[in-house]
């Protein structure tokens, strides 16, 4: 209830440009969500299976494609990337209705490729951390996932630097506006990905995630599959299309 309440508050306050209230509401929503998932999800069971009658035993903990949590992440991100594709469609829609798109002389969009490279490295490190965890290489897990979080933040900053350093003003033309929307969407998802990475580090340190009980890092890796696709599409459209057109 509180997660929904404060998440709704974030969007409502932002609609009216009440930025401080929106930020506070968003932070509270994130805190409530983290508390909920920390205390109520992926709990390590006392035993691996439970007898349900008629000689049938069912596992009490599952990770991967057979788990409800994995499918919840998959369905959520499928809907999420559908919304993202609609934004990409908006970019090309504006191209079809403007004689000159992007406008000339072109201001921006800046250099986006370093950000994409950094975020793909972070993606690889996240997948590697899942492997290290399952292999029992605890130190390697901590190192790879910590580096993934750091590189992710660097990649997000690199993406933002493109339109920021070239002075793209979203109020002057639809082109800089859609560039900022696509960039902001991607960076917001990177920030969520970093929160997930840090969450997995905390779960492993607290003993709530182990070699066998690894639903957290498995689900986060799935999220990063979709995020990597989002990054490639964003950079391909923003940085690649102007040069092609």
Language-model features: locations:
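...captures the hydrophobic TM-helix bundle architecture rather than a specific catalytic motif
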Residues: 1-245
